[in-house]
Swiss-Prot record:
Protein name per Swiss-Prot or TrEMBL: RNA chaperone ProQ
Originating species: Idiomarina loihiensis (strain ATCC BAA-735 / DSM 15497 / L2-TR)
Gene3D superfamilies found in the cross-reference section: ProQ/FinO domain
PANTHER family: RNA CHAPERONE PROQ (PTHR38106:SF1)
Amino acid composition bias (Basic residues), ranges on this chain: 137-149
Family: Belongs to the ProQ family.
Described function: RNA chaperone with significant RNA binding, RNA strand exchange and RNA duplexing activities.
UniProt key word Chaperone: yes
Biased composition (Basic and acidic residues): 99-115, 126-135
Compartment list: Cytoplasm
A cellular component term, taken from the record's GO annotations: cytosol
């Protein structure tokens, strides 16, 4: 009898959890606040499950609870649920505040990333033809000093670790990302805008 194929991607692990515990985890729609310490419950329930390792489980759970959809669900008075969907305790004001701060920081990073992307796109766009004669010459504005380019340094795959902050080279613009998983020659990362992607090790750099 062949062994079941192990789940290596956080997305697949979350889908599997939603399948095994539908009253607790969801992959779309409103999320439910999870019981504090639910990882221990998961590890115990899936102790004999060869499809999911504890390491993958922990990474997937962190990814799930840091998603905007989940952070929106953490509101004062909302009931946290266990793996069977049973209400166990209410979300405190302190926990809601922490969730809101995390959400605010995440949105700010995405906005900053989009702003940088738009600036880069504007620089690459061809300049429009200017009319030969203009009624009034516009006053020249002082040029802003150019931002220093980020210096990148190569990094070996075996020197990377889950949770490490890295730079991903996509085109000419390096993007900040967090390492989620390491798999042979590939590295799964989460960009600041929340997008999860898998890239080759030669696309991963560190700030010099």
């Amino acid at each position: 009898m062949s062994e079941p194929e192990k789940l290596t991607k956080s997305k697949d692990v979350i889908a599997y959890l939603a399948e095994q515990f539908p009253d607790c985890f969801t992959i779309k729609g409103d999320a439910k606040p999870l019981k504090i310490g639910i990882f221990e419950d998961l590890a115990k329930r899936l102790e004999d499950d060869d499809k999911v390792s504890k390491t993958r489980l922990r990474t997937a759970l962190r990814h799930y609870t840091n998603s905007w959809r989940y952070l929106y669900s953490v509101k004062t008075g909302a009931q946290r649920v266990n793996l069977d969907g049973e209400q166990v305790e209410a979300v405190t004001e302190e926990h809601q505040q922490h969730a809101q701060e995390t959400l605010k920081e995440s949105k700010a990073k995405v906005a900053e990333k989009n702003k940088a992307t738009n600036k880069a796109a504007a620089k690459k766009a061809p300049a429009k033809d200017k009319p030969e004669n203009t009624a009034k010459a516009k006053p020249k504005t002082a040029k802003k000093p150019a931002k220093p380019k980020v210096k990148l340094a190569d990094v070996e795959l075996n020197k990377l670790s889950v949770g490490q902050q890295v730079q991903v080279k996509a085109g000419n613009t390096p993007m900040s990302a967090t390492v989620l998983e390491l798999d042979k020659d590939d590295v799964q990362v989460q960009l600041q805008n929340g997008l999860i992607m898998k890239v080759k090790a030669d696309k991963i750099f560190l700030r010099a």
